[in-house]
Amino acid sequence: MDQEAVGNVVLLAIVTLISVVQNAFFAHKVELESKAQSGRSFQRTGTLAFERVYTANQNCVDAYPTFLVVLWTAGLLCSQVPAAFAGLMYLFVRQKYFVGYLGERTQSTPGYIFGKRIILFLFLMSLAGILNHYLIFFFGSDFENYIRTITTTISPLLLIP
């Protein structure tokens, strides 16, 4: 594969692989809690602790395809570095949500809200990339440098709670 092409997606691939490891960690937590309660077989119902782990995992799994789509779309069509940074932030927030959900449910709320904001940022980056493509196609105007500067400048603002 061409090194330039790999360089354009390597950060996105790293974030994706980290997210796969995180999914495996969440699934392992569900498995451990299931075995602790019922022995060998996996059960979908059980103790309150199992219900919380299972529900937290399910909530993370439900949002995962959306995260992957906006991460890769933003990274490919707009700018890889801010998209990868936002992706890493989303993974930290998802971890906070998962761990918070295992405690009191109010502890998971900041992670949930912060995660929505990061998904929105990635979605807006994707839209900017698509809009830029059509501006080039129809009018010959390329705003890629402006969009890249704006997204690179705004992405650290995701750290503000």
From Swiss-Prot:
Matching SUPFAM superfamilies: MAPEG domain-like
GO molecular function, one term: glutathione transferase activity
Keywords from the UniProt entry: Endoplasmic reticulum, Leukotriene biosynthesis, Membrane, Nucleus, Transmembrane, Transmembrane helix
Gene Ontology terms: cellular component: endoplasmic reticulum; endoplasmic reticulum membrane; nuclear envelope; nuclear membrane; nucleus
Entries under PROSITE patterns matching the protein: FLAP_GST2_LTC4S
Protein family membership: Belongs to the MAPEG family.
Name of the molecule in the record: Arachidonate 5-lipoxygenase-activating protein
